[in-house]
Amino acid sequence: MPKCDYCDVYLTHDSMSVRKAHNSGRNHLRNVVDYYQQIGHEKAQSVIDSITSSYAAEGQSSSNPMLHNPAAATPFPPFPPANFPGGVPPPFPPASGPGGMPFPPPGARGFPMPPLPGQPGAPPMPPFPGMPAGMPFPPPGGLPPNFQFPIPPPGGFPGMPPPGQGFPGMPPPGGNHDERR
């Protein structure tokens, strides 16, 4: 069991967390201050220098004993693949793509991505707001030059209720005046 040099107390075990907890304690800090006040300035400086040099020398070999040291570690043997005899079976059956289509095997090309809107072969885009449903779609290059969007009616966008009225199914402005409570 390690012993604190300043407190004459045995620590429960030698770990960084135990030392850190002990070193931040009120009694330990008071004992450290008392120790250095008793030995005087000259001796205190030499003790501090020796402690610092021992930590520096120790830090060159291993700065933090809790960190992983790759040179000292022994590698674990790799697990055999799931399809290899003696390999670990997969924890669940192979997943499938949308609509129950199985995913392609590794290394094979998957299903092609659908084209983005506006590309050849893509489904047509819905009509713009305010345009009748039967209007032809703009050409693939975009809208014709100087295209004028329809002007919305006064009070907002098409399909919106006139100003001052609630949406359908909503109580009128000013609250619910139902007297059946």
Curated annotation (Swiss-Prot):
Comp. bias regions, Pro residues: 129-143, 150-174
Segments of this protein annotated with the region Disordered: 129-181
GO CC annotation: commitment complex; U1 snRNP; U2-type prespliceosome
Gene Ontology BP annotations: mRNA 5'-splice site recognition; spliceosomal snRNP assembly
Zinc finger (Matrin-type): 2-34
Superkingdom to which the source organism belongs: Eukaryota
Keyword RNA-binding belongs to the record: yes
Location of this chain's protein in the cell: Nucleus
Disulfides per UniProt: none
Primary location: nucleus
GO molecular function, one term: pre-mRNA 5'-splice site binding
Keywords: Metal-binding, Nucleus, Ribonucleoprotein, RNA-binding, Zinc, Zinc-finger
Job of this protein: Component of the spliceosomal U1 snRNP, which is essential for recognition of the pre-mRNA 5' splice-site and the subsequent assembly of the spliceosome. U1-C is directly involved in initial 5' splice-site recognition for both constitutive and regulated alternative splicing. The interaction with the 5' splice-site seems to precede base-pairing between the pre-mRNA and the U1 snRNA. Stimulates commitment or early (E) complex formation by stabilizing the base pairing of the 5' end of the U1 snRNA and the 5' splice-site region.
Similarity comment: Belongs to the U1 small nuclear ribonucleoprotein C family.
HAMAP family: U1_C (MF_03153)
Subunit structure: U1 snRNP is composed of the 7 core Sm proteins B/B', D1, D2, D3, E, F and G that assemble in a heptameric protein ring on the Sm site of the small nuclear RNA to form the core snRNP, and at least 3 U1 snRNP-specific proteins U1-70K, U1-A and U1-C. U1-C interacts with U1 snRNA and the 5' splice-site region of the pre-mRNA.
Protein name, as recorded: U1 small nuclear ribonucleoprotein C
Organism this protein belongs to: Sclerotinia sclerotiorum (strain ATCC 18683 / 1980 / Ss-1) (White mold)
